[in-house]
A protein has these predicted regions:
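Bacterial Sec-dependent N-terminal signal peptides
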Residues: 1-24
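Acidic/His- and Gly-rich active-site-bordering loop/insert found
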Residues: 30, 34-140, 149, 164-165
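Sec/Tat-exported extracytoplasmic proteins
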Residues: 59, 63-66, 70, 87, ...
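Divalent metal-coordination and catalytic microenvironments
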Residues: 62, 83, 101, 114, ...
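Acidic/histidine-rich catalytic neighborhood of metal-dependent amide-processing enzymes
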Residues: 146-219
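Midchain, well-structured core segments that form catalytic/ion-binding scaffolds
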Residues: 197-325, 334-344
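His/Asp/Glu-rich mid-to-C-terminal helical/loop segments that flank catalytic regions of hydrolases
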Residues: 237-249, 253, 257, 322, ...
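Active-site-adjacent substrate-binding region
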Residues: 248-283, 337, 341-398
Length: 439
């Protein structure tokens, strides 16, 4: 998951109401009744439980041996061998250290992909796990080790249920997500000319309660842009500070009194993502102070900004230009541009609604939590796949507050409750089976 704010360090487990834990219990109550009516999903649950300890072990191997974006060589080899042992066709010639496992069902049908990212982070934060990273300065601090374990688990569970598969499942293990490069390069190197996909799915572990799946149609994150303002040199520090203050004030929109940059509040039941009145909708703000620097006798002002409404993005540059005109600095302004415009994750509405229906029918109404907002600071290059293929991206909770496990990505003491692996494998194995059988 690309880009993150350490303000998440501020959040407290008290923000997570008992509702999150109770929903897991309720889901379990509804589970047996629905599953008993469908043998294939009984098998999914059984096979998930059988393979769980094996997946925990390989997750820990990944955690101990992390590799940075573009250097996932050992990780690729472990994934490749795991998939080969399952009897899958395996391809490693698409881009970099990617792996594509191909599982063909006994019946012809759709082609669906499950994507898992592979790379680790360049940091040396405290890690409370016994199975710490053995590589100095490199850690799986974003949960991609969990993602890979889930991807391999789904492959194994579905391979045991091949007779129930109507179509083909492609398991895309993607390198270089943290650099926001891997998905784009896979597509640029012709992945879709070799595998013509109908749908694609993926997930990211988050700091929400373990076992909680969260998803919504359309945007999961705010639109993230890096704006650059190029000026003739000559303005004083005081003048530059005054201009950046005006720009920040102008590029701000939020509900009265709300602070959508305080990302720890995403889990607050009163204002967080699961509340229809969440503060994480209809906002615009810049991320902290503008970075100012000089180069080639010119001055530059740069900042990241976050906008939830796509139709407002094109209004930002003209608005900044107007500030310079109104402030009497029009002649000092050389250009205003977005210098980083990564796409954002946008879930296909039809597939998202179908996924919610499937998971709730099988695993209870609380199997999927409602999401009413858009998260700032985060992003994922899964968005590049969604530009080409209808797809859905899920959040999967990894925190267990009773145990002191906080799945706070990109932060010190990052941990994930490994029960999230079980939830991910079971839920999304069932989802893929059902989606293969639907138009």
């Amino acid at each position: 998951m690309k880009r993150f704010s350490l303000t998440l360090l501020c959040f407290a487990s008290s923000l997570f109401s008992a509702q999150g834990l109770n929903s897991q219990k309720e889901t379990g109550t509804n589970l047996s009744k629905n599953i008993n009516e469908q043998p294939v999903h009984q098998s999914v649950q059984l096979e998930t439980d059988k393979v769980f300890n094996k997946l925990v072990n390989i997750r820990r191997i990944f955690h101990e041996n992390p590799e940075l974006a573009g250097k996932e060589k050992q990780t690729q080899e472990k994934i490749k061998q795991y998939l080969l042992d399952l009897g899958l066709e395996v391809q490693t010639d698409h881009y970099g250290y990617s792996v594509v496992g191909i599982l063909k069902g006994d019946k012809k049908g759709k082609k669906i992909a499950w994507r898992s990212d592979m790379d680790a982070l360049p940091n040396d934060y405290p890690d409370p796990e016994v199975f710490k990273s053995k590589v100095k300065g490199v850690q799986h601090g974003c949960g991609h080790d969990i993602h890979m374990a889930i991807g391999l688990g789904i492959a194994e569970v579905l391979s045991k249920n091949r007779k129930s598969l109507k179509g083909t499942v492609y398991f895309i293990f993607q390198p270089e997500e943290e650099s926001f490069k891997g998905a784009k390069e896979l597509l640029n190197n012709g992945l879709l000319s070799k595998i013509n996909l109908d749908e694609i799915y993926g997930l990211h572990v988050t700091a929400t309660p373990v076992g909680q799946i969260m998803v919504k149609p359309s945007e999961m994150f705010a639109y993230q842009k890096k704006i650059r303002i190029q000026l003739k040199k000559g303005l004083s520090e005081e003048e530059l500070n005054g201009l950046t203050k005006k720009i920040s004030n102008s590029l701000f929109r939020a509900s009265s009194g709300s602070k959508p940059w305080e990302i720890q509040s995403i889990v607050d039941p009163k204002i967080g993502l699961t509340n229809p009145d969440t503060i994480f909708k209809d906002y615009l703000f810049t991320d902290g102070k503008f970075n100012t620097y000089s180069k080639n006798n010119e001055s530059f002002l740069e900042a990241y900004l976050y906008e939830t409404n796509s139709s407002n993005v094109d209004k930002i540059i003209p608005e900044v230009q107007k500030i310079f005109e109104d402030s009497g600095y029009k002649n000092q302004l050389l250009s205003v541009s977005f210098v980083q415009e990564n796409p954002t994750v946008i879930n296909n509405e039809k597939l998202t609604k179908s996924a919610i229906e499937i998971l709730q029918n099988l695993y209870g109404k609380n199997a999927v939590a409602s999401d009413y907002g858009q998260v700032p600071f985060f992003n994922d290059d899964f968005a590049y796949f969604q530009q080409k293929i209808p797809g859905v991206y899920f959040f999967l909770g990894g925190s267990n507050f009773e145990k002191g496990v906080i799945a706070m990505n990109h932060s010190p003491n990052f941990q994930v409750d490994e029960e999230s692996i079980r939830t991910g494998v079971k839920s999304f194995s069932s989802l893929l089976i059902e989606r293969l059988n639907r138009n």
